[in-house]
């Protein structure tokens, strides 16, 4: 797959599978209109397709299917210790999509699901109902924790649903993290100061090597700049940093490139973090044998695989030395394991 996917269109999914139970759901009806009827298949339950035995994750990555389904059970989960809650009293993530349009070698999703296909749960109203009891106090919800919701916004409409819900609930803060270049799906909306649009940025060489099917660095930066100019709060995330030969030059040049495009004063925050993954997810990633990222000699502590502490510290020192030339330390957040 080439690095030229600015947003989601039906051509990126070869077929649309729909659970019979959600055929009449308003979101299903809207999505159906975007597909050729000959490529729509009705099923009883999403697991008939998503959980089939003997699937090839690698092969499916080149011909993804979209599955529309009804989610039973919890949409909301406590935020992971591998992520940043940005100081909010409560940090939750929403799981309204299984799988991702993109195919990044270092992503834990590679080892999490049996399929590379995407399941979109259309009953997002149930997520909102589950969230209401948490909104008596300050709460952050990450909508793209285990997918890229903005990448499929042209089909799903879920980001707009989240933004509409957030307007009515003043204790709700959203982080919408993306590698997409699809800000145009939100361009005409009024910015909400409690919503942060966060772009994951990597050197172009890292994108080409590890972040398959994702937009280029140039495209992501343009989208982030458009968001800033439209009045949105924008966070830039150089995370995960991949320790590879010449990483110092790759990532310091990246920071220069970012701030040649974006006024540092316009960036709400910059986050920096090196690669980390749960030991169980890393084991699953190794079984796929797709990338050298899985076979680095990581250190494992408290079930978390990370770079050896000296390397992790060196990565952070190199990036901070460059980043603080542009942004003060109080607007930079870093991830470090607890020693």
Please provide the spans of the model-predicted regions.
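Flexible, acidic/Gly-rich N-terminal and inter-domain linker regions that tether
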Residues: 1-90
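Auxiliary Fe-S-binding modules of radical SAM enzymes
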Residues: 2-29, 256-339
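Conserved Radical SAM active-site core
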Residues: 67-90, 105-198
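Cysteine-centered iron-sulfur cluster-binding motifs in ferredoxin-type domains/subunits
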Residues: 95-104
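Structured alpha-helical segments in the cores of large, soluble enzyme domains
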Residues: 130-134, 187, 217-230, 319
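Structural preference for beta-strand elements that scaffold enzyme active sites
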Residues: 140-142, 173-175, 194-198, 233-237, ...
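Conserved radical SAM core fold
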Residues: 147-150, 181-184, 195-215, 240-244, ...
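Active-site glycine- and acidic-residue-rich loops that bind
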Residues: 175, 243-256
């Amino acid at each position: 797959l080439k690095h030229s996917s600015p947003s989601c269109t039906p051509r990126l999914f070869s077929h649309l599978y729909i659970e019979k139970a959600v055929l009449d759901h308003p979101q299903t009806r809207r999505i159906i209109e975007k597909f050729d009827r000959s490529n729509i298949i009705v099923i009883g339950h999403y697991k008939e397709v998503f959980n089939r035995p003997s699937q090839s994750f690698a092969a499916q990555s080149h011909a993804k299917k979209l599955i529309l389904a009804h989610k039973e059970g919890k949409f909301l989960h406590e935020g992971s210790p591998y992520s940043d809650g940005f100081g909010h009293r409560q940090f939750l993530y929403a799981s309204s999509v299984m799988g991702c349009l993109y195919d990044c070698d270092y992503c834990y999703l590679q080892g999490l699901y049996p399929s590379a296909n995407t399941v979109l749960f259309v009953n997002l109203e149930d997520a909102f109902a589950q969230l209401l009891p948490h909104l008596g106090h300050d709460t952050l919800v990450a909508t793209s924790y285990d997918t890229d919701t903005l990448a499929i916004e042209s089909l799903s409409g879920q980001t707009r649903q989240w933004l509409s819900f957030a307007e009515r609930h003043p204790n709700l803060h959203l982080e919408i993290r993306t590698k997409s270049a699809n800000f145009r799906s939100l361009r005409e909306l009024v910015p909400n100061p409690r919503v942060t649009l966060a772009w994951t940025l990597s050197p172009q060489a890292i994108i080409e090597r590890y972040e398959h099917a994702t937009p280029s660095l140039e495209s992501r930066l343009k989208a982030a700049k458009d968001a800033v100019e439209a009045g949105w709060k924008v966070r830039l995330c150089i995370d995960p940093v991949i320790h590879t030969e010449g990483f110092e030059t790759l990532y310091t040049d990246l920071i220069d490139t970012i701030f040649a495009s974006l006024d540092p004063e316009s960036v709400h925050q910059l986050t920096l973090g090196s690669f980390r993954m749960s030991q169980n997810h890393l084991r699953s990633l190794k079984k796929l044998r797709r990338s050298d990222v899985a076979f680095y000699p990581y250190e494992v502590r408290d079930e978390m695989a990370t770079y050896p502490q000296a390397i992790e510290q060196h990565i952070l020192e190199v990036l901070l030395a460059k980043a603080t030339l542009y942004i003060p330390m109080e607007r930079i957040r870093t991830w470090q394991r607890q020693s």
